[in-house]
Amino acid sequence: MTLQEQIMKALHVQPVIDPKAEIRKRVDFLKDYVKKTGAKGFVLGISGGQDSTLAGRLAQLAVEEIRNEGGNATFIAVRLPYKVQKDEDDAQLALQFIQADQSVAFDIASTVDAFSNQYENLLGESLTDFNKGNVKARIRMVTQYAIGGQNGLLVIGTDHAAEAVTGFFTKFGDGGADLLPLTGLTKRQGRALLQELGADERLYLKMPTADLLDEKPGQADETELGITYDQLDDYLEGKAVPTDVAEKIEKRYTVSEHKRQVPASMFDDWWK
C-alpha cells in the first residue's frame, strides 16, 4: 500500500461519493451521537465559509428530525468575529441558509486583546501575529464550550480530509470539538453536499481563508499552504498529482500527526 493509499484509508476518504447519501449518513451520525451522549443538541461557530455552513446546516437538519420524531434537541449557531469581519455579509447569508434554532454573536476582540496586552506586560514581548491568530481560534473554542456547557450542547468541529491531511487547524482551537460530521470529505465533496442542499453558490465558491492574521487579513488558505485545494482533493481521491505536490502533502501529513492524536504519553507509539 502506498503512502497515498494509507492516508486515504486513515482519513476515510472515498474517491467518489453520492452527495445525497452522504448527507443522510452524516445527519444520522449527528442524531445517533447526540442521543447516545444524552446531550441536548449542538453548538457551532459560523464564519460564513463552506465548512461551517455545511456543518451548521447538517446540525439543524439533525435537530429538526429529532424533534419531528418526538425527541428534544436544539442547535445554536455562534458568530465569533474579531472586530469587523470583512465578509460579514457571507456570514449572514450562511445563517440565513442554515436557519439555526438560535443565533448569537460574540465579538472576541476584547478578550483576545486583553490577553495579548497581559502577555506583553508580563513577559516583555508581543505575541507574534501567528501566535495571536491561534489565540483567536482558542478563544472561539472556549466560547463555544461555555455555551455548550451552559446548555448541555455538543461542540461541532468542521475538520474535513483536506484540512486533516495538512494539519491546517489550530490545535485545541478549531481542532477542539466533540464530534466531526465532515470527516472523510474532500473540499470539492463538501461543495457537492452544499449544492445538493441548495446553498447559494457564493457560500461554496468563495476563497477559503482561516482569517486569523492581523497582518494578512483574509489571506487565502492556499497561499499559506502553498498547495491548492484541487491538488489536495486530487491526492486524497487517489488521483495522480505532481511529485513535488505529493511530497509537500506527505510532509505536512507526517509533521502534523500530533494534531490528529490525543496528547502523547510514554505508552503511545504513534510518535516514535
Curated annotation (Swiss-Prot):
Single biological process term from Gene Ontology: NAD biosynthetic process
UniProt pathway annotation: Cofactor biosynthesis; NAD(+) biosynthesis; NAD(+) from deamido-NAD(+) (ammonia route): step 1/1
Q: Give binding positions for deamido-NAD(+).
A: 138, 171, 178, 258-259
In this chain, Mg(2+) is annotated as bound at 51, 163
Catalysed reactions listed for this entry:
deamido-NAD(+) + NH4(+) + ATP = AMP + diphosphate + NAD(+) + H(+)
GO molecular function list: ATP binding; glutaminase activity; metal ion binding; NAD+ synthase (glutamine-hydrolyzing) activity; NAD+ synthase activity
Q: Name one GO cellular component term.
A: cytoplasm
Q: Which domain of life is it from?
A: Bacteria
State the EC number(s): 6.3.1.5
The record's section on CDD domains has: NAD_synthase
The record, for Pfam families, names: NAD_synthase (PF02540)
**Where ATP is bound, by residue?**
45-52, 158, 187, 209
Query: InterPro entries given for it?
Result: NAD/GMP_synthase (IPR022310), NAD_synthase (IPR003694), NH(3)-dep_NAD(+)_synth (IPR022926), Rossmann-like_a/b/a_fold (IPR014729)
Query: How would you summarize the oligomeric state and partners of this protein?
Result: Homodimer.
Which HAMAP family does the record cross-reference, listed alphabetically?
NadE_ammonia_dep (MF_00193)
Stated family: Belongs to the NAD synthetase family.
Question: What is the stated purpose of this protein?
Answer: Catalyzes the ATP-dependent amidation of deamido-NAD to form NAD. Uses ammonia as a nitrogen source.
Name of protein: NH(3)-dependent NAD(+) synthetase
User: Whose protein is this, by species?
Assistant: Bacillus cereus (strain AH187)
Q: What is the lineage of its organism?
A: Bacteria, Bacillati, Bacillota, Bacilli, Bacillales
Encoded by which gene?
Answer: nadE
